Amino acid sequence: MAKTAFKGAPVTLAGEFVKVGTSAPEFTLVKGDLSNYTLKDGKGKYLILNIFPSLDTGVCATSVRKFNQLAANQPNTVVLAISKDLPFAQGRFCTTEGISNVIPLSDYRYTSDFAEKYGVLMTDGPLTGLLARSVVVVDPEGKVCLLYTSPSPR
């Protein structure tokens, strides 16, 4: 089991983090229009998976704003903002904040399938059931080429 921390206290994660050099696990997440988005939808492009607990936290909201700025100048790259927030809340946030260069996706519908495959589901602590803050980059061939996990999500 992988570990992270919340405000200095250890938090257990379901499974293990994906590994650099391995094939990215397939996933199905929910878009704002309630349709599905899968790993195959990004085939042939770099995918940046910005994974976080909730847009209702300052640090997570800031990360989405920053990735939105960076995504504007990245050819052949798609940035996915992934949380357990409902698609309606994600859409409201993106509209209010002028976020248009990232795709907000929710892991609410499929019983944490994505979170478990990527090793980011918090299984204890005050944020149990939410996603641990991390970034995964998938290359155009579908391989994980970079992984960052936050040592202490706030």
Task: Mark where each language-model region is.
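Short active-site neighborhood of thiol/selenol oxidoreductases, capturing the structured segment around
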Residues: K40-G58
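Short loop/turn microsegments at loop-to-beta-strand junctions
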Residues: A24-P25, I48, A132-S134
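Thiol-/selenol-based redox modules, centered on thioredoxin-like
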Residues: A132-S150
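Short, internal strand/loop/helix patches
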Residues: E97-A132
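Structural microenvironment flanking redox-active thiols in thiol-disulfide oxidoreductases
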Residues: A61-V102
